[in-house]
C-alpha cells in the first residue's frame, strides 16, 4: 500500500507510452502524493497524502 493517498485512496494508474510511430508500451502514471505529518486518532503520524487532498483542505498538517 505504498505511495497511496491515506485520505482519498489515489494511487498509480497504468497506461500506454506512445512513440512517434504510435507504438505502445505499458507505463505507470504516478499520483502526486506527498509524505506529510497529520493527526490520526489524535496522534501525529507520517503518511502519504495526495496534493489534491492537501489543496482542498481535507487534511490539516501538524
Swiss-Prot record:
Taxonomic source organism: Shouchella clausii (strain KSM-K16)
Entry's transmembrane regions: none
Gene3D superfamilies documented for this protein: Ribosomal protein L28/L24
UniProt name for this protein: Large ribosomal subunit protein bL28
Pfam assignment, any one: Ribosomal_L28
Region Disordered, annotated ranges: 1-27
SUPFAM superfamilies in UniProt: L28p-like (SSF143800)
One GO MF term attached to the UniProt entry: structural constituent of ribosome
Name of the coding gene: rpmB
Amino acid at each position: 500500500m505504498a505511495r497511496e493517498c491515506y485520505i482519498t485512496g489515489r494511487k498509480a494508474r497504468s497506461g500506454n507510452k506512445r512513440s512517434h510511430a504510435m507504438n505502445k508500451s505499458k507505463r505507470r502514471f504516478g499520483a502526486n502524493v506527498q509524505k506529510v505529518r497529520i493527526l490520526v486518532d489524535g496522534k501525529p503520524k507520517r503518511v502519504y497524502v495526495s496534493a489534491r487532498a492537501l489543496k482542498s483542505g481535507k487534511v490539516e498538517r501538524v
